[in-house]
């Protein structure tokens, strides 16, 4: 299955970082590896909640939070939706590649 958000950026390093902005998240789509972990950075004035599989993060305004599990510990390869709820409801697509 291919992501719908368009071009997916390759994620480098230990973390796949999702930036929650007042308008749209950045990036909209990321290719992630099994050993990487999710990090959510909240660039808004309100607390946001992020949900992906078994991972739920609550992130205060202008703060960040990191999942304790690597993607491969709770997701199967494929395209997954990181749901973000705050001032707006939005999502980031994460493409877990094996």
Predicted regions and their residues:
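N-terminal edge beta-strand
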Residues: 2-35
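Short, solvent-exposed loop/turn positions at domain surfaces
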Residues: 26, 53, 68-69
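Residue-level "contact hotspot" at macromolecular interaction interfaces
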Residues: 29-31, 58, 74
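Envelope-exposed proteins and targeting segments
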Residues: 34-36, 46, 65, 90
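Asparagine-centered strand-capping/turn motif at beta-strand->loop junctions
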Residues: 40-44
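Short, surface-exposed beta-strand/strand-loop-strand elements in extracellular ectodomains
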Residues: 47-56
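Extracellular/periplasmic metallocenter environments
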Residues: 61-98
